[in-house]
Design a protein with these regions (language model features):
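Transmembrane beta-barrel wall of Gram-negative outer-membrane proteins
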Residues: 69-181, 204-210, 413-415
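A beta-strand signature from Gram-negative outer-membrane beta-barrel systems
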Residues: 1-30
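Transmembrane beta-strands of outer-membrane beta-barrel pores
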Residues: 35-39, 107-111, 172-176, 216, ...
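Surface-exposed extracellular loop regions of Gram-negative outer-membrane beta-barrel proteins
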Residues: 231-233, 324-343, 387, 423-470, ...
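Outer membrane beta-barrel strand-and-loop segments of large Gram-negative receptors
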Residues: 266, 270-274, 323, 460, ...
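Signature of Gram-negative outer-membrane beta-barrel scaffolds
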Residues: 138, 175, 260, 264, ...
Length: 697
């Protein structure tokens, strides 16, 4: 949580260092098989025949020779989730060298059903008629099948002296999400609407790193070179919509735009190199140290999107009579209805939805560790040069590439001081500057239609980096081994924070995008406790608690039609606590966990003129909030002998509904006012009951 010059500066809340095992103490191999039951996701499950082919692999006749024309929805019974895992650790003696291997693989297949999910869009409250202004009022049934394959393979080679260590680390993950959504609702024009989305997404990520650590007299040197690859493919996302716009109560196709297919593909490559050196100094009894290093990263990204709509000649076609009123999956699955003179496909050429980019980051830093008796100071500065080039098209109808650079050159100072009163008590104070740079997708003009939001999502080419000043004052008390009580006060100032916003376009449609606010300030208190409870007679019990209170405010220039409010995504409080039981004699572990966060803005609304009710009050699309909910988890593990272990867990025991709300502030011409709760989304996630059985060789 404390900035330091040796760490990358592009973060806001904290930086996570992940260390994996190197050379194991002994050889081991274990296998895990497990299951999970979500009580909202058992029984009937709707799915479809997915497409995995790229457009490039299809022939010239897409409708009859390339597209998957099976639109029929299949139903099957779901009995739960499956999880499999394997972990291995081995060590060898190669002459005087030691070699270690850590390997792991896992597989999971899970089903999640969200039925009767309320999913609404609201505009500015209708003061004249005193009711909420629905841009869409709908109920969704959504069926998700998520699969994951993961693997890790790490090698470590240690020199005979132990002063030189080399590691090769590899992590691979492949995730897929197959989702079918059925939606029934009413549009802003008061038309009945039925729509569906057939969604299949695959994501692949690989991260490889070769590192070295070397200890010399007075110096500790470490280095790394790495390569990472990530992709996100959506092959053939299909959507259709029918409504009663033509004839009241009669659901039918209105236009060809109501049936669409879309292919998107995102590929990213990252190359990196890093070197650090720590030099121990000695001036009589004073032993300061210096640490300095450099980091370089080059990233490339390419995003491609193609969209097709179904079209027909309204006056001259050979389609069945009344085809507009037919069941759409039946209509589209019959190839007799496809082709020239029938239902044909037309590509929506939108070159502006494609982009590519390059990002070059170069950094160097210097820190000094200065001990002064009970006071120790770690001070440093980091320089980062970042150049992000976005290559996008300026016109939809043809390739028209234009390049734009987003460059930052920044110094990031950091200062950490620790005063140690004794072995149990110490006081910490820190300051550091960090940055939050926009991502490619946030500055691209590419438009993507999000079916869940029933809205388009678009980047903002004028987005700029946010710089954060962090101040932290922390008192720490260590009563005994493994115990800690700390109290902290912190302050963060954000210059131009990046936020997720939405606004009305075309009268009834919402567009989500990103924007910079002028500034924001967060000030808070944090309490962290880890305590053994044997002092009150509860042997083998321990308690942990982490809680924070945060006051957050975004500020805008004078005269702006925006309200001072909390920063998007920031909760006013959070609570994480757990009660743990650990009995080594019985080989039993039990944990009860509780989590709650305060309501937080997930989408920033905006002003839209005046209310039009005889008042000069500003009309606003309200901010959208994720509401608090109580989450209890219970887990237990029991070892049997030297080989078997049984793990059981209950997650989200209360299974409280998830709510997203807006709060419309309504003011009337006579001066009276009220607040109206508007439910943007509501669904029940279900509780999870899981077990796993581990066998160790």
């Amino acid at each position: 949580k404390t900035p330091s010059a040796e760490y990358p500066a592009d973060y806001t809340g904290g930086f996570i260092l992940i260390n994996t095992k190197e050379i194991p103490v002994s050889n081991s191999l274990s296998f895990t098989v497990g299951g999970n039951w979500n009580d909202a996701s058992l029984g009937d499950f709707s799915t479809f025949s997915k497409s995995t082919s790229s457009l490039e692999s299809m022939g010239s006749s897409l409708l009859t020779g390339g597209f998957n024309n099976d639109w029929m929805v299949k139903n099957k019974n779901v009995y739960g989730d499956l999880k499999l895992g394997m972990n291995g650790a081995y060590r060898w003696q190669l002459g005087a060298h030691r070699l270690g291997l850590i390997a792991a693989a896992n597989y999971s297949n899970e089903y999640r059903t969200y039925e009767d999910m309320q999913n609404n869009l609201f505009g500015v409250y209708d003061v004249a008629n005193d009711h909420s202004n629905y841009l869409r009022h709908s109920v969704d049934d959504q069926y998700n099948n998520n699969r994951r394959i993961g693997a890790m393979l790490n090698f470590t080679l240690l020199s005979p002296s132990g002063n030189h260590k080399y590691e090769l680390k590899n992590i691979f993950n492949h995730l897929t999400n197959q989702r079918y959504t059925w939606r029934e609702g009413v549009s802003a024009q008061a038309n009945l609407e039925n729509s569906a989305e057939y969604y299949y997404r695959s994501r692949t990520a690989y991260n490889g790193q070769l590192t070295g650590k070397h200890t010399f007299t007075g110096d500790q040197l470490d280095w790394s070179v790495g390569y990472a690859y990530a992709n996100r493919h959506l092959p053939d996302r299909r959507r259709y919509l029918v409504d009663d716009a033509i004839e009241n109560g009669q659901m039918a196709l209105t236009t060809g735009n109501d049936i669409s297919r879309e292919w998107t593909q995102l590929d990213e490559h990252i190359f990196s190199a890093n070197v650090n050196n720590k030099k121990e100094l000695k001036f009589n009894a004073w032993t300061p140290s210096l640490k300095f290093g450099a980091y370089g990263e080059y990233r490339t990204r390419e995003y491609k999107a193609r969209e097709f709509i179904y079209n027909w000649d309204a006056s001259n076609n050979s389609l069945p009579a009344g085809f507009r009123q037919m069941d759409i999956p039946t209509l589209l699955s019959d190839e007799a209805n496809l082709g020239a003179g029938k239902l044909d496909v037309l590509e929506q050429v939108r070159w502006r939805n494609n982009y590519s980019g390059h990002n070059t980051l170069g950094a160097g830093y210097l820190t000094a560790s200065l001990p002064f008796g009970p006071l120790s100071i770690l001070a440093g500065v980091r320089f980062e040069h970042n150049d992000m080039e976005l290559i996008s098209n300026t016109r939809d109808n043809e390739r028209s590439e234009s390049s734009r650079h987003y460059r930052d050159d920044d110094l990031f100072p950091s200062f950490n001081a620790t005063y140690k009163f004794n072995d149990q008590h110490q006081l910490r104070a820190s300051y550091g500057r960090t940055i939050n740079r926009p991502e490619f997708r946030e500055v691209s003009s590419s438009v993507y239609y999000d079916f869940d939001l029933a809205s388009s999502v678009q980047g903002n080419t004028e987005l700029k980096s946010c710089r954060i000043d962090n101040i932290d004052l922390r008192y720490e008390f260590y009563p005994s081994r493994g115990e800690q009580i700390s109290v902290a006060a912190f302050y963060k100032h954000f210059d131009s924070p990046i936020e997720w916003t939405y606004t009305v376009a075309g009268g009834t449609d919402l567009i989500y995008s990103y924007k910079n606010a002028q500034s924001a300030n967060n000030i808070g208190l944090e309490l962290d406790i880890r305590k053994d409870l044997s002092f009150i007679g509860l042997r083998n019990f321990s308690w942990s608690f982490n809680g924070a209170l945060i006051h957050s405010r975004v500020t805008f220039p004078a005269g702006f039609k925006e309200e001072n409010r909390p920063m998007q995504g920031q909760s006013p409080y959070l609570v994480n606590t757990g009660l743990f039981y650990r009995n080594e004699g019985q080989k039993l572990n039990v944990a009860l966990l509780y989590n709650r966060i305060g309501k937080r803005i997930i989408g920033v609304g905006r002003s839209e003129g005046t209310t039009g009710s005889g008042s000069d009050e500003t009309a606003r699309i309200p901010d959208s909030y994720e509401m608090p909910r109580n989450v209890f988890d219970l887990s237990a593990s029991k070892r049997f002998g030297d080989h078997w272990e049984l793990k059981v867990n209950l997650r989200d025991i209360l299974a409280e509904k998830v709510y997203y709300k807006q709060f419309a502030e309504v003011r009337y011409a006579d001066g009276s006012h009220k607040k109206v709760d508007e439910i943007v989304r509501r669904y029940k996630p279900g509780r999870n009951i899981g077990f796993s059985l581990v066998y160790k060789l």
